[in-house]
Amino acid sequence: MTEKKKNSDAPDYAKTLFLPQTEFPMRAGLPQREPDILKRWTDIDLYGQLRACAKGRPKFVLHDGPPYANGSIHIGHALNKILKDVVTKSQQMLGHDSNYVPGWDCHGLPIEWKIEEENYRSKGKTKPNFKDPAAMVAFRKECRAYAEHWLNVQREQFKRLGIIGDWDHPYATMTYPAEAQIARELMKFAANGTLYRGSKPVMWSVVEKTALAEAEVEYEDHTSDTVWVKFPVTSPAHGALSQASVVIWTTTPWTLPGNRAISFSNKIAYGLYKITDAPADNWAKTGDVLILANKLAGEVFKQARVTAYEKVRDIPADTLDAVECAHPLKGLSGGYEFTVPLLDGDHVTDDTGTGFVHTAPGHGREDFDIWTANARELEVRGISSTIPYTVDENGALTAQAPGFEGKRVIDDKGNKGDANEAVIKALVERNRLLARGRLKHQYPHSWRSKKPVIFRNTPQWFIAMDRDIADDGKANHGDTLRARALQAISVTRWVPPAGQNRITGMIANRPDWVISRQRAWGVPIAVFVREKGDGSAEVLIDDAVNRRISDAFEKEGADAWYAEGARERFLGDRAGEDWSKVDDILDVWFDSGSTHAFVLEDPAHFPSLRDIKRKADGGRDTVMYLEGSDQHRGWFHSSLLESCGTRGRAPYDIVLTHGFTLDENGRKMSKSLGNTVDPQKVIKDSGADILRLWVCATDYADDQRIGPEILKNTIETYRKLRNTIRWMLGTLHHFDRGEAVAFTEMPELERLMLHRLAEQSALVRSAYAEFDYKTVVASLAAFMNTELSAFYFDIRKDTLYCDPPSSPARKAALTVIDKLCDAILKWLAPVLSFTTEEAWRLYRPDAEPSVHLTLFPESFDNFRDDSLAAKWETVRAVRSVVTGALELERAAKRIGSSLEASPIVHVADRAMLGTLFDIDLAEVCITSNFEVREGDAPDGAFRLPNVQGVAVVVEKAAGTKCARSWKILPTVGSDSEYPDVSPRDAQALREWKALGVTV
């Protein structure tokens, strides 16, 4: 509007236009601007103000799943923390007291490894002797210092993302109060009878010399040796089976010295087979008689290079439990002289293998379960039920594996040892090997060392899943940890809902929880035991002893357990009894699983969380846990078990999970591929708000993708949103809220936009309540770009810029834009936390000191007008046809601006014609004039196939161009005082003149 004339005497109409004015820059400069906003949040104690203004509201507590205090944050951390921040901010603005106390997981093997590497191995120093109390405590202090360093580094990195929380008072599992409470939680399990020491096969890391939980392993591709092995039948001693062998298949030949049984299934059809032809040098010999599953016999003979065989007869499965075999290594070094029974097991299938499963109770959960289930019967039959310890902590076979002592399953570096080949060689020498091969399959690896783990029988501490829990010394039949956990899952809200089935399956099928680790840096299993001589132990239950332990931990930390004289100190007057101090430490998942106890239930250290009363307890407060989907077997899982075991219910009301972050091609990120995205670099280059927008624009329930192109698109989306905010701020520079126009006095277009505002408000509030941030971003982007910028703002620019100061239409438009700006800044605040804060301070310097202290706007339902919206659907359909026609004219260079046009719209439908009767289509279509005609249009008229009965012919606008508004009108020149403008613009100039503005 208004163009400068070459004639210097021409009027300067620009100063009479209400053009946008704002200090909100077009270029965001987020990397430079965001740190200033962070500083201001600290200066005004934003988190404290949030708590103060929300006092008395229902609490919504997002309990932070603690990241590990080791190294800088990665893109997965950024996504997780941003999601949490969006939850807490949006719940606060929905009317809750939304608390967020950040936390860290500080104990465990990764930190031990770093200390050993940096402080010992790299310097050629020997690792401390943990039997020495002073050395143990000194090493733990090194670990504590390391964790504290990275906690502080990560804290600053998380704050830079715009995360608002109680950063000055975070929780950490290594603080003294936390260690004390973790010990108390363990004591509760001891008191209710579910804590026990037993000998069971557990996943063992040879490299790290410790037991691992399921949550500490990753399944990776691994190639294993496979063998088909013959177990000669010894009973019955006569008949068809007397010369036969039962054939098993295994991917772990090294476990064969630990074999004590063969499992079969009474649901499988078995047969007796005889080899009638085989190569002379074959392991499988002509004349061998074998028992196999009928379904698998052909494949077994193929692997054994058998050229001909015959089926002798079927063998009823229900007769197999009477069969006994000799061990295939019988006689080696004087060992393996025991009977190998056949046991019926539900875990046996005929999908692969032979239909029989080699059963080594010291090397597998199912093996252990079936062996112990049959132990009493086996003893009656004269078969010892003792489980051997055939592999030691170094992955070496022991003296209980005669002939193989010292052979390594895995060496200290995690590489394959010589045990497999030694066992296979012995099988060949005894004519017990039928075939061998190699199999690539998924196998458990340590999440830290990335090396394969083994299953080995070892004394460990467990929490029982299926023992009746004895609260207050009284046990109720069926009240088990598994039953409690499954019930708790059913009353928890899972987002997305599929998470419920996932964790239900895990809890339903999981073994007892192994909670002991043979390491140094952690909370000790702070109990005293009396040995029973069979690997189990009696746990001392003594309130006075327990109180001395927890009080010491509270003041001195868990290092007190390792100090000289700890046994005597804590046992007190019971020190003369035969109680031993346990040296193992707790699984770190027990630490983090106990965080609810020392964060949500400790108002002394976390006063903002005082008096939480959850809906599950008859209150009105809500606790949410939010982590990646892998935490169904991690933190969600351990927290559920810990809380159900000690409190009878889950520690959470809502559990939200997100997927993993991949590169933009859908590949897993790795340094070797060079496809990682460093959040620190994104922040440095583009700003944290770009990362925040990316997080909220993705479907977090699935795996997310990120990379240069995706970030480029995110920046473009951000630019459009920022420009819309900037235009609103600039336009509102001229708004006096004292001149706001009442809804009933507004033009139709303004009332339509308030109807749209009401619709958008309902959508945004619902999406935030459902944690559906993708819908929030997508709907707001569409609303701001399409509904506002491309439609409403475009139409109203002439009114806003050129109307006289007294214009009711201009004031009505400003009133609507004020409501739009207020709502949009608040709606976007949880997502674009820095940008909206910057805009808010310019928009409402007289209001709350931060947009994050506001609430989302209440319902705009009083603005709803469905009939008006339906009418304007017709108007917009006509507008779309006119716009299409104008684009063709512009492309043909018959017009430049749309203001050079005067379209003629032909409308065939009389009802539609009535709808358009009172609409200023020139204003709506941004043309200088307009004409609507009833009836059919000429053949050359422009049409759109999706708008029936409307056609447009574009003619040039008649008249003279207004020097102020650029409209071409026949009335330009009719005002003698201002002959080069339209009457509307002449009136505006007179009002400006009265205000002292001359041109």
From Swiss-Prot:
GO MF term list: aminoacyl-tRNA deacylase activity; ATP binding; isoleucine-tRNA ligase activity; tRNA binding
One GO cellular component from the entry?
Answer: cytosol
UniProt main location, coarse? cytoplasm
Q: Where is this motif: 'HIGH' region?
A: 67-77
Q: Which residues form a coiled coil?
A: none
User: Main EC class of this protein?
Assistant: ligase
Residues annotated as binding ATP: 671
Q: What is its EC number?
A: 6.1.1.5
Q: Which CDD domains match?
A: Anticodon_Ia_Ile_BEm
Q: Where is this chain's protein located in or outside the cell?
A: Cytoplasm
Keyword terms, alphabetized = Aminoacyl-tRNA synthetase, ATP-binding, Cytoplasm, Ligase, Nucleotide-binding, Protein biosynthesis
**Which Pfam families does UniProt cross-reference here?**
Anticodon_1, tRNA-synt_1
Disulfide bridge positions per record:
none
Question: Alphabetically, which GO biological process terms does the record hold?
Answer: isoleucyl-tRNA aminoacylation
Sequence motif 'KMSKS' region, location on chain: 668-672
Record's catalysed reaction(s): tRNA(Ile) + L-isoleucine + ATP = L-isoleucyl-tRNA(Ile) + AMP + diphosphate
Name the positions where L-isoleucyl-5'-AMP binds.
627
Describe its assembly. Monomer.
**PANTHER family (UniProt xref):** ISOLEUCINE--TRNA LIGASE, MITOCHONDRIAL (PTHR42765:SF1), SOLEUCYL-TRNA SYNTHETASE (PTHR42765)
- By its UniProt entry, which HAMAP family does this protein fall under? Ile_tRNA_synth_type1
Describe the function of this protein: Catalyzes the attachment of isoleucine to tRNA(Ile). As IleRS can inadvertently accommodate and process structurally similar amino acids such as valine, to avoid such errors it has two additional distinct tRNA(Ile)-dependent editing activities. One activity is designated as 'pretransfer' editing and involves the hydrolysis of activated Val-AMP. The other activity is designated 'posttransfer' editing and involves deacylation of mischarged Val-tRNA(Ile).
Notes on the domains:
IleRS has two distinct active sites: one for aminoacylation and one for editing. The misactivated valine is translocated from the active site to the editing site, which sterically excludes the correctly activated isoleucine. The single editing site contains two valyl binding pockets, one specific for each substrate (Val-AMP or Val-tRNA(Ile)).
Q: What is this protein called?
A: Isoleucine--tRNA ligase
Native source species: Nitrobacter winogradskyi (strain ATCC 25391 / DSM 10237 / CIP 104748 / NCIMB 11846 / Nb-255)
Taxonomic placement:
Bacteria, Pseudomonadati, Pseudomonadota, Alphaproteobacteria, Hyphomicrobiales
